[in-house]
Amino acid sequence: NRMSPHFIFNVLNQEMGSRDGENKKELSSLVKLMRRNLELAEQMCVTLKEELGFVQTYIDLQRRSLGPEFKVTIEVGEDVDTNQLLLPSMLIQIPVENAIKHALQGKEGERRLWIDVHRSGTYICVRITDNGGGFKLNSANRGTGTGMKVIMQTIQILNAKNKEMIETSVHNIPLPDGETGCEVSF
């Protein structure tokens, strides 16, 4: 049994009409995020600009529950053309969601998330890093890994078709302030 996305968006848009101010803005962002998620889920690759726009909408929605201690830094190298660079859909969003959900939500104190996209020779490097204590294999807060499996399967398909391989790494890193973080890189 499936619900029609058209029906869901009609109901949400009707609900949005009955709200005002900040409540309307939040619901509008949620609707935008859901609509864009459906669109992106149908595409194998998107531009970096599209992916970062989607990620920014997601981060903005999460900001309320994470509070003022949640700080995000997004850096894109000047030599990276966000309109031309294609990458697998959800490549950045899924690790960002994982970082927020599994590392930063329950963290005390400052919660940091860094997204860095830069050129290294002929390659583009994408890094998503958090200060949530690092990846713990046996943690109770660990998810099912479904999101990362989707990314890995997509990368596997692309690597089978393309000359240039996409390499993936998930590892814990020491941060300059003495904390440990998790870094996902492509």
Would you name each region that the model predicts?
Residues 1-171:
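Two-component histidine phosphotransfer core
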Residues 180-186:
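Short C-terminal beta-strand
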